Every structure is written in structure tokens, then in C-alpha cells.
From Swiss-Prot:
Disulfide topology: none
Gene Ontology annotations for the cellular component aspect, listed alphabetically: cytosolic large ribosomal subunit
The protein's name: Large ribosomal subunit protein bL25
GO molecular function: 5S rRNA binding; structural constituent of ribosome
Organism (species): Nitrosomonas europaea (strain ATCC 19718 / CIP 103999 / KCTC 2705 / NBRC 14298)
Keywords: Ribonucleoprotein, Ribosomal protein, RNA-binding, rRNA-binding
Family of this protein: Belongs to the bacterial ribosomal protein bL25 family. CTC subfamily.
Assembly mode: Part of the 50S ribosomal subunit; part of the 5S rRNA/L5/L18/L25 subcomplex. Contacts the 5S rRNA. Binds to the 5S rRNA independently of L5 and L18.
Amino acid sequence: MQIEISANSRKLHGTGANRRLRSQGRLPGVIYGGNGDAQSIELDHKDLYYKLKMEAFHASILSISIDGKKEQVLLRDVQMHPFKQQVLHIDFQRVRQDQKIHVKVPLHFINADIAPGVKLSGGMISHVATEIEISCLPKDLPEFITVDLSGMTAGSTLHLSDLILSENVEIPALLKGDNLPVATLIAKRGEAGESSEE
């Protein structure tokens, strides 16, 4: 299911114009990239505020309708008020179906409770990363990546190279030789010493 957003072209610019928009419950934003020029837009603040709470909104191709014309975009930047529950500005990037995109997608960790290091050794799993940057064509973009922790033993670490991805999805960090950790199973205190004595 694709998330849909409704927006209107924004004619007025500047701090004063944006302040007036916000006082009317509207949110200033911009769309850039793809084959088009940068376009100033305004959106319904309340609608966007609640959509931003959805995990998929941050890592999916979104359908935005500007004055009735639809475009495919990615969320690129959100500026929040320092202490109010208010979005100040939002940026979207146009997506071309024939061009690879770089997107951070969330990691969903499963089977921690049946990992031998947890179940048998009483260890604890530490999530070193909660999202990773991937590169793929828009049609291949996963909403999230599942990380299976069921094989983790005390003291073991899962790395980027251990993640199971579809064949058309790449991890730029791995292409650069950075096989970063994703999760570590921390042994219960004294566990490592006890197991080495046995």
C-alpha cells in the first residue's frame, strides 16, 4: 500500500509567509530532483505530523499529489520545532524509476528470545544499528530489513554482511569495505570465564 500525500503549490516565500502558513495549520515544504525544477509546496500540518509517526513514511516511495498532479517522492528532510510538537519544514526528492536511490531503511530484529546466547546463557542482545543505508531501484525498495537473531551465541556479533537482502539491493558501506556491526550478544557477567573453565 503506497502512502499518499496531498499538497498545493506555494507562491509566497520567506519567513513571514511561512509563519502565516503555519498559523493557518499549513506546512511549508519543497520538492526537488528528478527531471523537474525545485517546487515550493504547502501541506496540511496535522495530516503530515501523524504520517511522520509511521515508520513506512520514512523509508518508502510516497505518492504526492500537487494541485492534482501526482509524483513519486522520497522523504529527505524534516525540520522540527525545538520544543513544540510542530513540523517547521519538509523536503521531498522526486524519484525516477530508472535511477538507483540511496535510502536509510529500518532494521526489524526477530527471534532474540530463542538465540542460544540469550536462552541458554542468559546474555543480552545489543542493537548496534537500528537502520542502514541501502541502494536500489525504487521498485526494489524494502520497507524494512529483517534481522534474524536466532543463531547468536554469547559474545557473537552480526555484521552487515550477515543481512539477507533481495538480489537487487546493495549496502553501500559493504561496497566500500565497511562491514559494520549490526547486533552484538553480550554475555552474562562471569559467563565467558565459566565456559572457558569447563
